[in-house]
């Protein structure tokens, strides 16, 4: 089997998940496991590996859906914004990057193994609610759309135009948000 070709380090999590799954299938629980960072597993196409072994997964690639990364490069940041944050290493996950991610693209005919998408926000990069809001908004709108809209129906121009309506909502709620994708009033 494919399991026999893996190193012990890579095979052990699969073995443990299968071990715990077998005795509990009578009550139909959903077994969830996280790829621990002990071997930097987040830099591999884990959705493909999970599908190869018959596991369902929630798609959360770091290079697309980690919302603690900067929204734009430091050179593109508006100096008038209260917070421009995110990881300071130059890593960027823009609204466009999030929106253009197709969670099923790497699965081909195995799309049944995709349970959904998840955006991660590691809050050690934020000091208060305003910074957290800035990191999330408006990328949450892009994440929401990729979660429910088939890739064939996505339209960046349409999304960008619809996104403009959120500016007045964010302002009315006194939320801090990245204004890079909003047209001047």
Regions found by a protein language model. Give the residues of each.
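Single conserved hydrophobic/aromatic residue that forms the stacking wall/gate
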Residues: 1-10
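Flexible, acidic glycine-rich loops studded with aromatic residues
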Residues: 15-185
């Amino acid at each position: 089997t494919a399991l026999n070709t893996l190193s012990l380090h890579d095979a052990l999590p699969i073995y443990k998940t299968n071990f715990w799954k077998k005795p509990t299938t009578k009550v139909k629980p959903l077994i969830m496991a996280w790829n621990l960072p002990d071997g930097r597993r987040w830099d591999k196409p884990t959705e493909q590996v999970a599908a190869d072994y018959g596991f369902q997964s929630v798609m959360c690639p770091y290079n697309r859906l980690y919302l603690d990364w900067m929204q734009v490069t430091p050179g593109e940041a508006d100096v008038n914004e209260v917070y421009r944050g995110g990881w300071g290493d130059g890593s960027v996950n823009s609204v466009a990057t999030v929106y253009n991610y197709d969670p099923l693209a790497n699965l081909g005919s195995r799309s049944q193994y995709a349970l959904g998408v998840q955006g991660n926000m590691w809050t050690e990069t934020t000091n208060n609610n305003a910074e957290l809001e800035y990191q999330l908004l408006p990328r949450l709108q892009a994440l929401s759309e990729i979660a429910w809209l088939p890739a064939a129906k996505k339209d960046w121009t349409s999304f960008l135009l619809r996104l403009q309506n959120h500016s007045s909502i964010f302002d009315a709620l006194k939320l801090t948000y990245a204004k890079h994708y909003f047209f001047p009033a």
